[in-house]
């Protein structure tokens, strides 16, 4: 059983043969659930073929018609969650100093991991992101490179637009905050690939085979 709130609406309708218009007061109903006919008030004061009555019934039918849902509920919540994570990530972004980043990497055990010393990792981070945890680079195919190591959404992390394997099992926005844990754990997984740090073009072009001691010189661990 529905609940109705009545109201009166002013309706301008042609009621004379000469085309004159009269103002009629018709009682309408705004309905919630199952309720009365909202056009009932016009039925008693207009001819059966009145254009105003016809329009009223059309509006009533439209109001009762089910509305098309633009997005499935799951997609809507996913979009909201992704947007929220983007906002949170941007609020926690940080640009590290050289020694500050070297210490973080040292504490996470990157020095010597898979045969690469700490300077390799610091050099990589500089030439990929400039030590900026919030760095995002957009590729022509729609994929993104994310965070301090510019980890690609093609294979390693997930965005709303990507259908990649997400091998690190994280959202790409998780790589954009000043807590480096997700970025480092994912990078450690990437470096297990046959190319090692050679997976990153920046490391091959700027760091590989060079004296990198300056990257950690003067840093206190």
UniProtKB/Swiss-Prot annotation:
The record marks 93-94 as: Cleavage. The keyword RNA-binding does not apply. GO terms for biological process: fusion of sperm to egg plasma membrane involved in single fertilization; sperm-egg recognition. This is Sperm acrosome membrane-associated protein 3. The chain crosses the membrane at residues 70-90. Its main location: membrane. Sperm surface membrane protein that may be involved in sperm-egg plasma membrane adhesion and fusion during fertilization. It could be a potential receptor for the egg oligosaccharide residue N-acetylglucosamine, which is present in the extracellular matrix over the egg plasma membrane. The processed form has no detectable bacteriolytic activity in vitro. Signal peptide: none annotated. Residues 91-221 are extracellular. It comes from Mus musculus (Mouse). The processed form is expressed in sperm (at protein level). Expressed strongly in testis and epididymis and weakly in pancreas. Residues 1-69 are cytoplasmic. Gene3D superfamilies: 1.10.530.10. Interacts with ASTL. The keyword Membrane applies. Belongs to the glycosyl hydrolase 22 family. Keywords: Cytoplasmic vesicle, Disulfide bond, Membrane, Secreted, Signal-anchor, Transmembrane, Transmembrane helix. Residues 94-221 form the C-type lysozyme domain.
